[in-house]
């Protein structure tokens, strides 16, 4: 890691472990919070406010992650830290082991039950997003994060769009141009339709499901025209009415040129052992007409994910998500930056410099539920259990607890030592909802630690007044001030330590590195960069080559 890549005030707060990836627009590290010990992922966006488009994308992603961060299948944004140059920005996320794209490229790693579990959690996240009238617009395997317990987190909301501020009807939901991964684009996006619906996400989910079943992308087009060709020779051809409903100016011409190509079915693209219900769900998601595709709520009731279906855990918002800046308003890049920092500082209730302390995104205040200790890994063939999470904070009553709730789950409230993250403590004599007089029992093998309650400001002032002592200078002991009658602390006295004697091992460490392996000799230490997955069974499997978008 180059020291110049991380600002000093960020390195003081987070201990950088290793670099996870780097691209043209940013770099991601695995790090540890020095205050709490929590492992996090830090994403540095280069020149996040270089122009109006990049500034708007950064603004949308942060605002939407603050809205959706309490959902168990959406990545949590923990902190926002401006860079020293006022151009870059650091986003601090919870850490995950890998992503679905890396898992698929490992080969036949996922069993059928894992595929069902992963797709069910993706549907849960998509339903929650769509209930707020937000479209992700960039769902693909690389944006689906996983851990060894088969937990799913949807990330990268940079291309997401809120429809809450737009008028109803096709005229209000105008389709703007955006650069998303071609292999997962819906036909209406490829045909430059004048409007769109949440069906664009459902098409992308169908492509993700097909890639999990097949082991490689369903439609790996090399251009927009080739992408349409692969789609139209696989799915049933649309009617003229369906083409007219898209509002595309040249969709009929494209269909005329591509409609005469030989057809193949989805069955021919998938392995012969594909479950029939998986194929049925895939066909219902990959419909050409957006209004004929299943919604996320309908797909959650499909037999393919029936064993995981639980309405109490499939949350929905009761109101639309409305961004602080109207979707129709176009601000300049400096205005987006100023507005972003102003909003987060106002919501955190703190006026400190964001460059020194971070902006303290309030998404970390969501109540979480600890995962059970006996969670199965991806390598096991046992049915993965989707954790029953605490409902996200939203307007309206909370949904009742699932009948299948695991009693060993322990409800915790995440707090940080940073005052920007702290929740207001309960009043005198109050306890948080659901708290009892005794601390909750921890799972076996977990060492619990009980800390004494910190004294209040009143008790501290009384103790200070009662223990006041006359302070005088003691020139015989170095001239420092000392309290009369106070006992001297030996650790503060000058210590006359003996001079260190040379020992056997006081020589250059490079002498012994050659016998400790090539990795340690070359790198000065054992690096985790040799594997893409940490603390899981995924890293032991060979990497199979596969196409990438």
Swiss-Prot record:
Q: Give the enzyme class.
A: transferase
Q: What is its EC number?
A: 2.7.11.24
GO CC annotations on file: autophagosome; bicellular tight junction; cell-cell junction; centriole; ciliary basal body; cytoplasm; cytoplasmic vesicle; Golgi apparatus
Q: Which positions does the motif TXY occupy?
A: 176-178
Recorded catalytic reaction(s): these are: L-seryl-[protein] + ATP = O-phospho-L-seryl-[protein] + ADP + H(+); L-threonyl-[protein] + ATP = O-phospho-L-threonyl-[protein] + ADP + H(+)
Location of Phosphothreonine modifications:
176
Location of the protein in the cell: Cytoplasm, Cytoskeleton, Cilium basal body; Cell junction, Tight junction; Cytoplasm, Cytoskeleton, Microtubule organizing center, Centrosome, Centriole; Cytoplasmic vesicle, Autophagosome
Annotated catalytic residues: 138
- Could you tell me one molecular function GO term of this UniProt entry? chromatin binding
Region called Ubiquitin-conjugating, residue ranges: 1-20
Q: Where is this region: Requires for interaction with GABARAP, MAP1LC3B AND GABARAPL1?
A: 301-382
* Regulation (activators, inhibitors): Activated by threonine and tyrosine phosphorylation. Inhibited by dual specificity phosphatases, such as DUSP1. Phosphorylation and activation in response to DNA damaging agents, serum stimulation. Constitutively activated when phosphorylated on Tyr-178. Activity depends on the relative rates of MAPK15 autophosphorylation and dephosphorylation by PTPN1.
Segments for region (Disordered): 370-507
Q: In which tissues is it expressed?
A: Expressed at all stages of oocyte meiotic maturation.
Entry's Gene Ontology BP terms: DNA damage response; dopamine uptake; endoplasmic reticulum organization; negative regulation of cell migration; positive regulation of cell population proliferation; positive regulation of metaphase/anaphase transition of meiosis I; positive regulation of spindle assembly; positive regulation of telomere maintenance
Bias (Basic and acidic residues): 403-416, 493-502
UniProt entry tagged with the keyword ATP-binding: yes
* Keyword Phosphoprotein (UniProt): yes
Ranges for region Necessary to interact with ESRRA, to regulate its subcellular localization and to inhibit its transcriptional activity: 266-286
Please quote what the entry notes about the protein's domains. Answer: The N-terminal region (1-20) is the minimal region necessary for ubiquitination and further proteasomal degradation. The TXY motif contains the threonine and tyrosine residues whose phosphorylation activates the MAP kinases.
Function of the protein: Atypical MAPK protein that regulates several process such as autophagy, ciliogenesis, protein trafficking/secretion and genome integrity, in a kinase activity-dependent manner. Controls both, basal and starvation-induced autophagy throught its interaction with GABARAP, MAP1LC3B and GABARAPL1 leading to autophagosome formation, SQSTM1 degradation and reduced MAP1LC3B inhibitory phosphorylation. Regulates primary cilium formation and the localization of ciliary proteins involved in cilium structure, transport, and signaling.
Q: What is this protein called?
A: Mitogen-activated protein kinase 15
Give the encoding gene's name.
Mapk15
């Amino acid at each position: 890691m180059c020291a110049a890549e991380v600002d000093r005030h960020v390195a003081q707060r987070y201990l950088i472990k290793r670099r996870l990836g780097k691209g043209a627009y940013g770099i991601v590290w695995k790090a540890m919070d020095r205050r709490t010990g929590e492992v996090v992922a830090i994403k540095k966006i280069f020149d996040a406010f270089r122009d109006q488009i990049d500034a708007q994308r950064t603004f949308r992603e942060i605002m939407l992650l603050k809205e959706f961060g309490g959902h168990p299948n959406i990545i949590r944004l923990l902190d926002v830290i401006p860079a020293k140059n006022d151009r870059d920005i650091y986003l601090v996320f919870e850490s995950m082991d890998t992503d679905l794209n890396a898992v698929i490229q490992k080969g036949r790693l996922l069993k059928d039950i894992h595929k069902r579990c992963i797709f069910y959690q993706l549907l849960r996240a998509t339903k929650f997003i769509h209930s707020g009238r937000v479209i992700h617009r960039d769902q693909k395997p690389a944006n689906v994060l996983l851990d060894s317990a088969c937990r799913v987190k949807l990330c990268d909301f940079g291309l997401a769009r809120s429809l809450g501020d737009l008028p109803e009807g096709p005229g209000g939901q105008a389709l703007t141009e955006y650069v998303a991964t071609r292999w997962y684009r819906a036909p209406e996006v490829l045909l430059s339709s004048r409007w769109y619906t949440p069906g664009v996400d459902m098409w992308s989910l169908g492509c993700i499901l097909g890639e999990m079943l097949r082991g490689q992308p369903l439609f790996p087009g090399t251009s927009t025209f080739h992408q349409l060709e692969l789609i139209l020779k696989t799915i049933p051809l649309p009617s003229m009415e369906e083409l007219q409903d898209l509002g595309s100016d040249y969709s009929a011409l494209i269909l005329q040129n591509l409609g005469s190509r030989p057809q193949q079915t989805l069955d021919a693209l998938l392995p012969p052992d594909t479950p029939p219900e998986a194929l049925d769900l895939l066909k219902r998601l990959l419909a050409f007409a957006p209004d004929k595709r299943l919604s996320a709520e309908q797909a959650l009731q499909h037999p393919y994910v029936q064993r995981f279906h639980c309405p109490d855990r499939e949350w929905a918002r009761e109101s639309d998500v409305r961004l602080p800046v109207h979707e129709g308003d176009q601000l300049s890049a400096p205005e987006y930056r100023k507005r972003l920092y102003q909003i987060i500082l106002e919501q955190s209730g703190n006026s400190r410099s964001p460059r020194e302390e971070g902006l303290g995104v309030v998404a970390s205040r969501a109540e979480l539920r600890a995962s059970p200790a006996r969670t199965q890994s991806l390598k096991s063939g046992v049915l993965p259990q989707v954790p029953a999470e605490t409902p996200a904070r939203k307007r309206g009553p909370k949904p009742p607890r699932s009948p299948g709730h695991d009693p060993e789950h322990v409800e915790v409230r995440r707090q940080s030592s940073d005052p920007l993250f702290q929740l207001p403590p309960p009043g005198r004599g109050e306890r948080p909802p659901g708290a009892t007089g005794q601390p909750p029992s921890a799972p076996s093998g977990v060492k619990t630690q009980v800390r004494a309650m910190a004294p209040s400001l009143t008790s501290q002032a009384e103790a200070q007044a009662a223990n006041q002592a006359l302070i005088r200078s003691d020139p015989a002991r170095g001239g420092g001030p000392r309290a009369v009658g106070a006992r001297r602390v030996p650790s503060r006295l000058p210590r006359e330590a003996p001079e260190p004697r040379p020992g056997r091992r006081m020589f250059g460490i490079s002498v012994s590195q050659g016998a400790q392996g090539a990795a340690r000799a070359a790198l000065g230490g054992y690096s985790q960069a040799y594997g893409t997955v940490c603390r899981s069974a995924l890293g032991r499997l060979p990497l199979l080559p596969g196409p990438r978008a």
